[in-house]
Amino acid sequence: MPDTPKADIPSDNAALEAQGIASELIDDSAARIAELEAKNADLADAYLRAKAEADNIRRRADDDIAKSRKFAVESFAESLLPVKDSLEAAIVSHAAGKGSPEQVIEGVHATLRQLGQALERNKVLEVNPPAGTKFDPHQHQAISVVPAEQEANTVVAVLQKGYLIADRVLRPALVTVAAAK
C-alpha cells in the first residue's frame, strides 16, 4: 500500500462524531416539529372556539333583531288601546240610548285628542302645511294646480293631512298648489 497521509483517511472517530451530530440534529428537529404541532393544535383549537363564539354572537344578534322587529310595534299598539276602548264605550253608550249628540261630539273630540297624544308619544307627526307654504314634494302630494292670488308653487289648501315618523314620510299631505301666473 502506498503511503497516504493520515489526514486523508477518515477516522472512525470522525464518522462517529458526524453521526452523533446528525442524530442531535434529528432529535432537535423532531422536538421542534413536536413543539410546532402542539402549537398548531392549540391555534386550531383557539380558532374553532373563536369561530364558534362569533357564530353564537351572530345568532344572538339575529335573534335580537327578529325580536325587535316582532315587538317594535308593541309600544305603539299599547298606546292605541285606550283610543279603542273609548270608541267601544261610545258605541255601547249610543246603543243604550245614552248621551246627547253634543255629548257624542264631545266624546269624539276627546278620543281624537287621545289618538293625537298616542301618535305624538310614538313620534308620529302631522304634516299640515298652512296656506302659502312652499310646496315640498318630499312631504306634499299635489292633487291639483289652481289659479290663486298667492305665489306660484305654494300650498293653497290641504285636502288630507300627511304624517311623518322619525323624519320619514308615512303619508304625504294631499294639497292643492297655486298655479304660475
Swiss-Prot record:
At the top level, the lineage of the source is Bacteria
Alphabetized, the UniProt keywords read: Chaperone, Cytoplasm, Stress response
Gene Ontology BP, a term: protein folding
State the GO CC annotations. Answer: cytosol
Q: Does the keyword Cytoplasm apply?
A: yes
Give the signal peptide as a residue range, or say none if absent.
none
Q: What is its main location?
A: cytoplasm
Q: Does the keyword Cytoplasm apply?
A: yes
**GO molecular function, a single term:** protein-folding chaperone binding
Q: Which Pfam families match?
A: GrpE (PF01025)
**Gene3D superfamilies per the record?**
3.90.20.20, Head domain of nucleotide exchange factor GrpE
Which PROSITE patterns would you find in this protein's record?
GRPE
Location comes to: Cytoplasm
General function of this protein: Participates actively in the response to hyperosmotic and heat shock by preventing the aggregation of stress-denatured proteins, in association with DnaK and GrpE. It is the nucleotide exchange factor for DnaK and may function as a thermosensor. Unfolded proteins bind initially to DnaJ; upon interaction with the DnaJ-bound protein, DnaK hydrolyzes its bound ATP, resulting in the formation of a stable complex. GrpE releases ADP from DnaK; ATP binding to DnaK triggers the release of the substrate protein, thus completing the reaction cycle.
Protein family (similarity comment): Belongs to the GrpE family.
Q: How does it assemble?
A: Homodimer.
**Listed PANTHER family:** GRPE PROTEIN, GRPE PROTEIN HOMOLOG, MITOCHONDRIAL
Which named protein is this?
Protein GrpE
Q: What is the organism field in this record?
A: Leptothrix cholodnii (strain ATCC 51168 / LMG 8142 / SP-6)
Gene name tied to this protein: grpE
